Amino acid sequence: MNFIGVVGARKFNDRKAVEDLVVSLPKDSIIVTSGCKGVCTWAKAKAAEKDLEALVFSPDLSNIRSRFEIPKRYYQRNCELIEKCDFVHAFISKEGGYSGGTRFEIEYAVKTRIPAKVHWEGRMDEIIYQRQLPFYPEKQFCAAAWQNFFSQAVAF
């Protein structure tokens, strides 16, 4: 049984791509998604049609004291959703580009070492698996590398 995340931009227009993905999944897959319009609702509907289980994450909007807490609750929901997944499919729209909650979900998947496949609307797909995204500055692990080198040299 695999937990497959299906997330995406509200402005993503290729409903068939989302539905084709859901249809292609093994029967024991569980779709993990949110209740957002577009990609998430299409995935949920197609999962129901194909008798696949769907786990829908919604933000906890109870006990909110100010409107500034609302985005935090949505990002918390996104974290919980991604943490539940074994693999994430993220759909990026041409119009909206790489932004918002979908961007956060992809970055969080990378951070937590959950493999992700990015479906760019009208372009080729990209699989991201435990590596830096191209827009991140490359991290230098110089101190760790030197420490490892010297500890091995001293061991001889």
Question: Whereabouts are the PLM-identified features?
Answer:
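N-terminal intrinsically disordered, low-complexity tails enriched in polar/charged
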Residues: 1-4, 142, 156
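Intrinsically disordered, low-complexity segments enriched in serine/proline and basic residues
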Residues: 140-154
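Acidic/glycine-enriched connector segments
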Residues: 2-3, 8-138
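Positively charged, lysine/arginine-rich intrinsically disordered segments
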Residues: 133, 155-156
